[in-house]
Amino acid sequence: MKLLEKMIYVEFLMIIMAMWVVPMSYGHGAMIGNAVEAPDVAEAPGINDPSKALDPNWYDARATFYGDIHGGDTQQGACGYGNLFRQGYGLATAALSTALFNDGYTCGACYEIMCTRDPQWCLPGSVKITATNFCPANYSKTTDLWCNPPQKHFDLSLAMFLKIAKYKAGVVPVRYRRIPCSKTGGVKFETKGNPYFLMVLIYNVGGAGDIKYVQVKENKTGWITMKKNWGQNWTTSTVLTGQGLSFRVTTTDGITKDFWNVMPKNWGFGQTFDGKINF
């Protein structure tokens, strides 16, 4: 009887192991036909996890395009940057779906994107872009739910899309990863608002690219925490006109830099100031 029990037990273990091992043979990273060979992918990190800000792993998503070849319709946008050519972003931009946009906190983040697993439409190589806009969900649709949660989706400028896929594809599977942003010159601070409501757009941010905290300081006070208004516009109701201003900026990877004496005492609204240094 004991021998029979052992045989049943061993057979049961073999069944369990078979159920566990077989699905593993269908993992990510396989090349289908003559498709562009893609890197291995991992489970996407939580968008609020700063430790994953520059996670080197690749993740699955999809991509489409919007605007024309000259960047029409890609200017302005939900990150508040305005003229992307004047601000140094140019055509290397994308609008992010809700799952990636993180209520604007991802604005300024940089990604590398490649088309994968679709040999009919994919082109070799990759593009590097900055997140500058939001691709809104359309909850009335039942198909082509590109930017609806929980989809991870990049709506690229047409110029960037054509570097990785053919125009007629429309939408393609891609893999993406966060990369450090490489920017020329210092971080820029553009003033908006009025004497009782100072709003500062911060752009041209290197390193992680996206901002987690901002503080402002005039010569006679300590650091004042600013609130994110929308995109990368940060505000304070403290009256700071007539004072020279410095800024303390923390990016999502936890790096903090102080930008001393960015704005002179006679600064005005609608002006842009160079922070001189970058991440």
Curated annotation (Swiss-Prot):
Gene Ontology BP annotations: anatomical structure morphogenesis; plant-type cell wall loosening
InterPro entries for this protein: Expan_Lol_pI, Expansin, Expansin/allergen_DPBB_dom, Expansin_CBD, Expansin_CBD_sf, RlpA-like_DPBB, RlpA-like_sf
Location of the Expansin-like EG45 domain: 76-186
Residue ranges annotated for the Expansin-like CBD domain, each copy included: 196-275
Keywords tagged on the record: Cell wall, Cell wall biogenesis/degradation, Membrane, Secreted, Signal
Any matching Pfam family: Expansin_C
Main location: secreted
Subcellular location: Secreted, Cell wall; Membrane
Domain of life: Eukaryota
Keyword presence, Secreted: yes
Signal peptide per UniProt: 1-27
GO cellular component: extracellular region; membrane
Protein name: Putative expansin-A26
Originating species: Arabidopsis thaliana (Mouse-ear cress)
